Amino acid sequence: RSVSRGLGDVYKRQPEDMLKAMRLYRAIKRVCKDEILRVVTLSCSKMIERTGTTGCLALAMLNDEGILAGCEGDLQSIFTLLAAKALTGKVGFMANPSMINTRTNELILAHCTIGLKQTEKYIIRNHFETESGIGIQGLLPTGDVTIVKCGGECLDEYYLSTGTLTENTNFINMCRTQVRIKMNTPAEYFLKNPLGNHHILIQGNYEVLLNEFLQANTCKRTE
């Protein structure tokens, strides 16, 4: 069932799951405050093993509060988030290409966390891979989007494309937040030689702005 933003729906989660996730959020936020951090990334698998909960809720809340927070120690994606925020003023959605259809030129991006402010509605669920803890199923507005990723050993390569977010999907075999994108460039890139797994989705068309910045810094565009 749908819910209004800021309220949230809880889907088969126990109170202790929320308590553990909130304790982790408070701990990470305290570290960020003490160390004066504006950007952070977690080692998600180790975090689950050591704390018995997931970082998905913590990352969502930190991003909403202006601390750029990413998953799985992915520094290239964190840099991409940082550059995108500086240029566009928007927090991106870090996600995995989870379904690629080269015939229709469509892509589904999915992940178990997203800043709640990026969503129209959201549902509190569990983490897909472990079926434990807290995961976020965010429902995003349809419309123009930009997909970008900075990569390469020296962060001197980048992928940049635009498309249209056409649908929020709800497949059982992928992460909780899922969006279908009709790409404006060939989706084959994600199968052939992508710049890593995570890519960043920004709501709106910022191709010209991002391309000018990356070209000015002598980065090479890959397609």
Residue ranges and their predicted role:
Residues 135-223:
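Extended hydrophobic packing segments that form well-structured cores
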Residues 53-69:
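A short, gly/pro- and small-residue-rich
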